[in-house]
């Protein structure tokens, strides 16, 4: 989920 954190950092990566 590390990649999701980078890609979703601008959207909902705040929770991850």
Curated annotation (Swiss-Prot):
Annotated GO biological process: butyrate metabolic process
The organism's place on the tree of life at top rank: Bacteria
EC number: 1.1.1.157
Recorded name of the encoding gene: hbd
Pathway annotation: Lipid metabolism; butanoate metabolism
Coiled coil: none
Family membership: Belongs to the 3-hydroxyacyl-CoA dehydrogenase family.
Keywords, in A-Z order: Fatty acid metabolism, Lipid metabolism, NADP, Oxidoreductase
Lineage: Bacteria, Bacillati, Bacillota, Clostridia, Eubacteriales
Protein name as annotated: 3-hydroxybutyryl-CoA dehydrogenase
Statement: the UniProt record of this protein carries the keyword Membrane: no
């Amino acid at each position: 989920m590390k990649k999701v954190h980078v890609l979703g950092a601008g959207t909902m990566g705040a929770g991850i």
